[in-house]
Structure formats: C-alpha cells, structure tokens
Amino acid sequence: MQKLSFRQGLAQILNLLLVLSSAYMGYKTLSFVTDCESPVVVVLSESMEPSFQRGDLLFLDNRNPSFDEAKVPSVFEKIIYGSPVGIGDIVVYSLPDRPIPIVHRVVKLYESENQTHLITKGDNNKIDDVAMFPKSINYLDRENHILGVVRGYFPYLGMITIWLTDYPILKYIMLGGLGLLTLIQKEEQ
C-alpha cells in the first residue's frame, strides 16, 4: 500500500470540495430558476396513490405569473413563466405546526382580492385536508403555504433517502463503503 503525498491528499480534498460545491450551486440555481426553496421533494406516504407512490422524487416549480385575462398564454409562455395553480394541480405545501411538507391535489380554488386560496386532498384520502389545518387556517394561501407545484417526477428514486432515514445503519455502511472505495482506488494507481 502506497502512502499518499501531501499534494495528492490535498488534491483529493480539493476535488471532493469541488464536487460538493458544484452540486450545491446546481441545487441553488435550480431553486432560483423555479422560485422554490426546495425544488426537489420525496413522497413520504401513500396518500397520493395511485398518482405517486411512496419514494417518488418530485420536481417543483413555484413561479406564479399573472397573465392578462383576455389573452390565453401560449405553451412557451407557460414553460418560461410558469402557470397559475388550478384545480387538479398537485401542490406541495407546509403548515406552521408540521415540519414535513405535504403533497396533495387541489380540489377547490377561491380567488379573492388578488389572492388564491386552495383546499387540497390526497388522491388516496376520503376527505379533504381542512381537518389537518390548525384552527387559525381555513384554507391554504398561495403565498404563505404553497412550496411549489409538481411539474415532473422520477419514480422510486427517493426511496434512497427514505431508507437512509428509516435505517440509520445504512448511512454508516454507505460511508464506510465510500471510504473503502477511496482506499482501493488509490492502491491501484
């Protein structure tokens, strides 16, 4: 087994920092472009089956344009500027007393004084979400509660994060495997 020189060790650390900072910058760029604090979320429950399964990775967009009512926006405008939330859209929202975001479909929509108010429901649930809301909230407010609108998904890719959360030993096995891989890779060079 060959010992790494100081320069080789430093180069490895800098390469690792470059990869991590690039991933972080990519995520932050995606956050900026989609106007979402968290543009990627994982479905954690079965409440949206059959539309989404537990472990699906969802991609969100939170751009809320105001189109001229007389003009129907083109497909291009909807892609570039986003589109308003409508009945049937799947949104991700958070409530003040719940740290984990909820993924549900919009079933009722109210417009008042230039604000959009929503009522949501999981596809696999029998009743809407009003019962989950704190007493001070009667509906979801687009500006204060909605984190984003689902624009795409990747099936089951989020199961990795669920497994790492449910079984913490997997984190240590994965980190140990990565460390071992690094040692083996250096031995071969």
From Swiss-Prot:
Q: Is Membrane a UniProt keyword of this protein? A: yes
According to UniProt, the reaction catalysed is:
Cleavage of hydrophobic, N-terminal signal or leader sequences from secreted and periplasmic proteins
Query: Does the record carry RNA-binding as a key word?
Result: no
Q: How does it assemble?
A: Component of the signal peptidase complex (SPC) composed of a catalytic subunit sec11 and three accessory subunits spc1, spc2 and spc3. The complex induces a local thinning of the ER membrane which is used to measure the length of the signal peptide (SP) h-region of protein substrates. This ensures the selectivity of the complex towards h-regions shorter than 18-20 amino acids. SPC associates with the translocon complex.
Record's domain comment? The C-terminal short (CTS) helix is essential for catalytic activity. It may be accommodated as a transmembrane helix in the thinned membrane environment of the complex, similarly to the signal peptide in the complex substrates.
Which residue intervals are topologically Lumenal?
26-189
Annotated Gene Ontology cellular component terms: endoplasmic reticulum; signal peptidase complex
A Gene Ontology biological process term? signal peptide processing
Which organism's genome codes for this protein?
Schizosaccharomyces pombe (strain 972 / ATCC 24843)
- Subcellular localization, per the record? Endoplasmic reticulum membrane
Q: Which family does it belong to?
A: Belongs to the peptidase S26B family.
Q: Which residues are glycosylated?
A: 114
- Which residue stretches are annotated as topological domain Cytoplasmic? 1-8
Give me the gene this protein comes from.
sec11
**Superkingdom of the source?**
Eukaryota
Q: Which residues form a coiled coil?
A: none
Give the main localization category. Answer: endoplasmic reticulum
Q: What does this protein do?
A: Catalytic component of the signal peptidase complex (SPC) which catalyzes the cleavage of N-terminal signal sequences from nascent proteins as they are translocated into the lumen of the endoplasmic reticulum. Specifically cleaves N-terminal signal peptides that contain a hydrophobic alpha-helix (h-region) shorter than 18-20 amino acids.
Give the GO molecular function terms.
peptidase activity; serine-type endopeptidase activity
Entry protein name? Signal peptidase complex catalytic subunit sec11
- Residue ranges spanning the membrane: these are 9-25
